Regions:
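SAM-dependent Rossmann-like transferase core, predominantly class I methyltransferases
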Residues: 1-42
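General small-molecule cofactor/ligand-binding pocket signal
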Residues: 16, 95-97, 168-170
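Conserved SAM/SAH cofactor-binding pocket of Class I
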Residues: 29-107, 113-116
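A short SAM/SAH-binding and catalytic strip from SAM-dependent methyltransferases
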Residues: 112-125
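Conserved beta-strand signature within the Rossmann-like core of class I S-adenosyl-L-methionine
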Residues: 141-149
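Core SAM-dependent methyltransferase catalytic element
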Residues: 172-184
Length: 184
């Protein structure tokens, strides 16, 4: 196992990860950049789509103490480490679940905040399905924040606009773009 401590939004988190999970030795630039642009509300109920070892959902759980936070990933190894990291950091309002996209998420669950570091290697069809499923699982006024590699930014803008009717590019860096869509 790989252990490290890293500050997220000015406060430390303790992580355990392993080889074979995305960015095992330190938090990836894309996720850190995304977290700088998310507007957390104390009572948000969030979902971290493709959580890896957990940083987005863990941060939501800490920043939004009155809400419940679900972290999902289709990789069972990532899910085990995300569970461990939530326990280790005493995040009792976070739950981690194995799910390919929204497939195994309770149908009646509604979220006010969706966060994702979309994997560059998933297909565009896959991304589009995630957006449709997310839309259906979001309450009115909910926000969907995503970080993608710059090569996917036009695709994200088109897809968010088709599914949500809006798309707001919050930041474009050298490598990554942060995009937000809001459900009416």
């Amino acid at each position: 196992d790989i252990q490290f401590t890293q500050d997220v939004l000015g406060k430390p988190f303790h992580f355990t990860s392993t080889w074979g999970i995305f960015s095992p030795e330190k938090l990836d630039e894309g996720s850190l950049m995304l977290l700088d642009y998310i507007e957390f509300k104390a009572d948000d109920h969030s979902i971290d789509l493709g959580c890896g070892y957990g940083v987005l959902g863990m941060t939501a759980a800490r920043e939004c103490p009155n809400g419940q936070h679900l972290l999902i990933d289709k990789d069972f190894v990532a899910v085990e480490y995300a569970k461990l990291n939530c326990q280790k950091n005493h995040l009792n309002n976070a739950q981690v679940q194995l799910s390919n996209g929204f497939r195994d998420v309770e149908k009646d669950k509604k979220f006010s905040l969706v966060m994702s570091n979309l994997p560059a290697k998933a297909s565009k069809e896959q991304h589009y399905l995630y957006l449709l499923d997310a839309y259906n699982a979001m309450e009115s006024g909910a926000r969907f924040y995503v970080v993608t590699i710059n090569g996917l930014r036009d695709f994200m803008k088109r897809s968010f606009t088709e599914v949500f009717g809006n798309s707001d590019k919050l930041k474009q860096g050298k490598t990554y773009t942060i995009t937000l869509a809001v459900k009416d």
